[in-house]
Amino acid sequence: LTFGRINTLILHKGTKLNPINRLITALLIILFPLAGLSQQKVGLVLSGGGASGLAHIGVLKALEERGIPIDYITGTSAGSLVGAMYCAGYSPEEIEAYVKSNDFQLMTTGKLKASQRFLYREADANGSLFNISFALDTILTKSLPTKFITSSFFDFEMLKLFGTTSASNDNNFDSLFVPFRCVASDIENKKSIVFSSGFLNQAVRASMTYPFYLDPIRVDGTLMFDGGLYNNFPADVMYQDFNPDFIIGSNVSYNAPPPTEDDLISQLTNMLVSHSNFSIPCNEGMLIEPENTIGTFAFNEVEAAIQSGYEATIAKIDSIEFFVNKRITKEEITLKRNVFRGKIIPLKVSSITNNYNKKRDLAYARKSMIRERKNEILDVSKLEKRYYRLYATPQLDFMYPLLNLRPDSTYNLNLEVRKAKDFRLDVGGHFSSRAVNTGYIGLTYRSIGNTASSIHASSYFGKFYGSVKLSYELEVPSIFPISLSAYFVMNRWDYFRSFATFFEDVKPSFLVQNEMYYGLKINHPIGN
């Protein structure tokens, strides 16, 4: 007998059996339920919920401690990250250590570590207060920002976590340590998309693309957003794809309350997000609901979230153990995990390809990453350094990495590259009650192909100080790039006795100094 699947052997009254048949019948009566017991399958459903979704780690910890096996996992958003890490062979303790690390905290804010910054390609400081990038054909519609943080760190971390695991298992999610599904949202067709194969890092990234927080990505040409928009608790996916004997659900999310006349956020939320069903779609299941008091982006409260999930699971563990008869020891699951991870081919990149501007290759990106003529092999350290160097290129707006396994057991890194908009406008200045008010405006044109180039014009203007600068820069791509820049600068200082602002003209001026210079520079980095 297994819960949810009752195996029965029926003997009608008066049935006569010979000794051999009696023996066979007795064995069947003994072994039939045990056979069902050994086949009992348990599925775990993990909801979305932002930072509160890290409570799922506590759920995994409690289940493993009590020997409850997990045969399938489905997840949305934060649940897809936690679930994918478990299915990729990470233990609950390793997942917990990762989300508590400084790297994870930086990743959630869009910042880089000091060692990842490439100062050579960072713009010089100026008087800009804000900037906007635009193209001449779409000045208004495509100039508004679509993200709150830069995802370069996040995307590369997902590649390191999942890229080799996915490629080493033929990008088949059924071949992972635990079979896995995650969901993302296709906003064009207003439907939920279930990932059962493909690039695992890409599937998790799509499932976690919170609108206006992260850059959306395309999967097979379709723009993807957070799975929680249309299905924030994929219990239906678990039931339809795996049909386990028992479903455990961990939910830290909820449906938005009805909109009100004076609450813009509630109106937008109800327009964008569909209500999800947070119940188990069958009788054979148990719903765990950790306390949800953590904000969507409060990733600094990781420890509290994990503890909440652990305590909520322990509170229901007796009921779970009553229905789930199968057990697995810590030693057994550790051995299985080590065997699975031992089959993963280490990350060594021997070739670089990229998709840019409707499948056209961008030579600049390729030449900046690898020495092709020398048959260079990149380990994780070299790959990481060059990835962030390329990402720092002002002419590139977005870059997403994917791994393909080659026949020689090395990897090809494929970069989905998106060019920055042609023009960038910077506006700012210094505003004071004294007579040193200064405005600033700058305009840059950017181009990229076999080389990267930019034309820049800027001006400071005010009563005391005025300046005009024109410059042109050309960069030749290589592992250690070389750039050539020409510049022309005019400065003017007007030393006067006045507390005027921009427009008052005081005569006579006591001293006016003018300066003009130009030059040519060759730049070459010796490190980051």
In which residue ranges do the predicted regions lie?
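Bacterial Sec-dependent N-terminal signal peptides
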Residues: L1-K41
